[in-house]
Swiss-Prot record:
Binding, [4Fe-4S] cluster: C288, C291, C295, C496
SUPFAM superfamilies membership: Aldehyde ferredoxin oxidoreductase, C-terminal domains, Aldehyde ferredoxin oxidoreductase, N-terminal domain
Cofactor: how and how many bound: Binds 1 [4Fe-4S] cluster per subunit. Binds 1 tungstopterin cofactor per subunit.
Pfam families the record matches: AFOR_C (PF01314), AFOR_N (PF02730)
Protein name: Tungsten-containing aldehyde ferredoxin oxidoreductase
Keyword vocabulary terms for this entry: 4Fe-4S, Iron, Iron-sulfur, Metal-binding, Oxidoreductase, Tungsten
Organism: Pyrococcus abyssi (strain GE5 / Orsay)
Enzymatic reactions: an aldehyde + 2 oxidized [2Fe-2S]-[ferredoxin] + H2O = a carboxylate + 2 reduced [2Fe-2S]-[ferredoxin] + 3 H(+)
Assembly notes: Homodimer.
A single MF term (Gene Ontology): aldehyde ferredoxin oxidoreductase activity
Cofactor(s) recorded in Swiss-Prot or TrEMBL: [4Fe-4S] cluster; tungstopterin
InterPro entries, sorted: Ald_Fedxn_OxRdtase_dom2 (IPR013984), Ald_Fedxn_OxRdtase_dom3 (IPR013985), Ald_Fedxn_OxRdtase_N (IPR013983), Ald_Fedxn_OxRdtase_N_sf (IPR036503), OxRdtase_Ald_Fedxn_C (IPR001203), Tungsten_al_ferr_oxy-like_C (IPR036021), W-dependent_AOR (IPR051919)
Binding site for tungstopterin: R76, N93, G95, R182, A183, G185, R186, D338, D343, R446, K452, D491, L495, L497
Region forming the signal peptide: none
Length: 607
């Protein structure tokens, strides 16, 4: 096979066994990689109703066939497991250099099972694999962990995926971190890693990924890179200002969620924009492996020195969503969230939930520990500087916040003020200003998520063409489905979503065929994406998903018209779109997958 080693590493932390397993090209053609591999093994080997923190839950690190190649952004990997935040599938994507290094070591994926009886880390040096004691780094921050483990193994070139104290303490939105600030962020994958007493995976590889026709592959790659460089977003806005270039754009379009989605316009947006960040704090760009875009930021603050980020989502989650406009405070908060290993979107969403519950009188000052604790008021930067540390350590009221926004709101009888889907906090786009995006939120397999359908592209940015954000026709619903399947394909290939700014489905076909030696059509590849999406949906249904209750949005977004800005008066007309979405997906009226659809997609073994 080209693009693959055909090798999976299986590690049982309970009994310490380490096994090499193989797969063939038929398997690769069906599941492609990353999310595809992950959902296959979860469905095949695990009861979807298992407790996410039990040893029976599996934690899978998987690459794609283009991971480790020179394909633009070909450094991605994913972490797949059952989420302790949602109770459903978690698949978190990260860039940096860890994914490529895992591929260079000769492995396509790692399946982690069981639970160690003490803190350990996994050391992979090509085909040599060891489970080592991690007691000396347990409790350390992410940067401290990376430094200590590089010194211990005597190799500064190893790549490390690790958890911080938030993962160790099973904060339900803990992330897996690599290269300091790259995060497999959402769904609590870091908490699952912590529940297994696995502190880190350290990898060093010396192999190179083989492609079917190197000359043809490089010709195709050069063409795709040129398209990306000519694109105004991939070749202009993102390299110049990072992902926070979206702050002003989304705010001007009136869907920049402010103060827990109470409105879509933030009066201080420019002060936390990518333009402002570049002018005040930027030192240099920092691209991930094989990336011609280079959206990563290295910033400098006197209080913490050099740091990376924040990205658009983090800037919003720790800024406008909390009514906070001080960019230095946002950068510092993002830094510590990374060091502790926390998903900034869920962190900000949880704090925003606490702020609204507090301001509405549902959370009292005595509930959070008395008069000496910083009050949860919108705009209070002290909340960032204080509660992030308490959450990561599960200290005081931080222990309650560490459960996430939904469980917090449920505890204080205010679930209508939790802005999330399937218990996962929503990201930085108010769907009252992009209704197709709202449908994507509601039907997303991992809960509140933007990057598994990113309808912001057509509805706001005009990719692949401009669509009216308030159109809810069949064409819009079909586009949501296409984007869901396409993003599953891009993930499975081992590429970054940002390549869609400049590339389309045919471009991914070209790269994959040249690398793998296949003769697949665009439709063949999109069918893989559809298979993955439906398999993840099936896992959720088996885990207990009630579609008609849970394929929904917060009441505010469905019933409270946007109070100001370009989308004033709009709500998300989800009830008018959802039945057509189910029908166009080939599902039943109550959102379940019929047997004939499963057979059509080759999923009959999971019926």
């Amino acid at each position: 096979m080209f693009g693959y080693w055909g090798k999976i590493l299986r590690v049982n932390l309970t009994d310490g066994t380490i096994k090499e397993e193989t797969f063939n090209e038929e398997f690769a053609k069906k599941w492609l990689g990353t999310r595809g591999f992950g959902i296959y093994f979860l469905l095949k080997e695990m009861d979807p109703k298992v407790d996410p923190f039990s040893p029976e839950n599996k934690l899978i690190f998987a690459t794609g066939p283009l991971t480790g190649t020179s394909a633009p952004t070909g450094g991605r990997y994913m972490v797949i497991t059952k989420s302790p935040l949602t109770g459903y599938i978690a698949m978190a994507n990260s860039g940096g250099y860890f994914g490529a290094e895992l591929k260079f070591a000769g492995w396509d994926a790692i399946i982690i099972e069981g639970k160690a009886d003490h803190p350990v880390y996994l050391y992979i040096h090509d085909e040599n694999v060891e489970i080592r004691d991690a007691s000396k780094v347990w409790g350390k921050l992410v940067s401290e962990t990376e430094k200590a483990l590089k010194e211990e193994v005597g190799d500064k070139h190893v790549q490390i995926a690790s958890i911080g104290p938030a993962g160790e303490n099973k904060v339900r939105f803990a992330a897996v971190m690599n290269n300091g600030h790259r995060a497999a962020g959402r769904g609590g994958v870091g908490a699952v890693m912590g529940s297994k007493n696995l502190k880190a995976i350290v990898v060093r590889g010396h192999k190179r990924v083989e492609v079917a026709d190197k000359g043809k592959f490089m010709e195709v790659i050069r063409e795709k890179i040129e398209k990306l460089k000519k694109d105004p977003v991939a070749g202009g806005g993102l390299p110049k200002y990072g992902t926070a270039v979206l702050v002003n754009i989304i705010n001007e379009h009136g869907l920049y969620p402010t103060r827990n989605f109470q409105t879509g316009v933030f009066e201080y947006a420019y002060e936390q924009s990518g333009e402002a960040m570049a002018a005040k704090y930027l030192i240099r760009n920092k691209p991930c492996f094989a990336c011609p875009i280079g959206c990563g930021r290295v910033n400098y603050l006197p209080s913490i020195g050099e740091t990376e980020g924040p990205e658009y989502e983090s800037t919003w989650a720790l800024g406008a969503n909390l009514g906070i406009n001080d960019l230095a405070s946002i950068i510092e908060a993002n830094h510590f969230a990374d060091e502790y290993g926390m998903d900034t979107i869920s962190l900000g969403g949880t704090l925003a939930t606490a702020m609204e519950l507090y301001e509405r009188g549902l959370i009292k000052q005595e509930d959070i520990g008395g008069e000496n604790e910083p009050p949860f008021r919108f705009g209070n930067t002290e909340v960032l500087h204080y509660w992030i540390h308490k959450i990561a350590k599960r200290e005081g009221f931080g222990d309650i916040l560490a459960e996430g926004g939904y469980r917090l709101a449920e505890r204080f009888n205010g679930t209508e003020y939790f802005m999330g889907v399937k218990k996962q906090e929503l990201p930085a786009y108010d769907p009252r200003g992009a209704e197709g995006h709202g449908l994507g939120y509601a039907t997303n397999n991992r809960g509140g998520c933007h990057i598994k359908q990113y309808m912001i592209s057509p509805e706001i940015l005009g990719y692949p063409y401009k669509m009216d954000p308030h159109d809810i026709s069949d064409e819009k619903v079909k586009m949501v489905i296409l984007f869901q399947d396409l993003t599953a394909l891009i993930d499975a290939a081992g590429l970054c979503l940002f390549t869609t700014f400049g590339l389309g489905a045919d471009d991914y076909r070209d790269m994959l065929n040249a690398a793998l030696g296949w003769d697949f059509s665009t439709e063949d590849y999109l069918k893989i994406g559809e298979r993955i999406w439906n398999a993840e949906r099936l896992f959720n249904l088996k885990a207990g998903l009630d579609p008609l209750k849970e394929d929904t949005l917060p009441k505010r977004l469905l019933e409270e018209p946007m109070p100001e800005g370009p989308n004033k008066g709009h709500v998300v007309r989800l009830k008018e779109m959802l039945p057509r979405y189910y029908k166009l997906r080939g599902w039943t009226e109550d959102g379940r997958i019929p047997e004939e659809k499963l057979k059509e997609l080759g999923l009959e073994e999971f019926i």
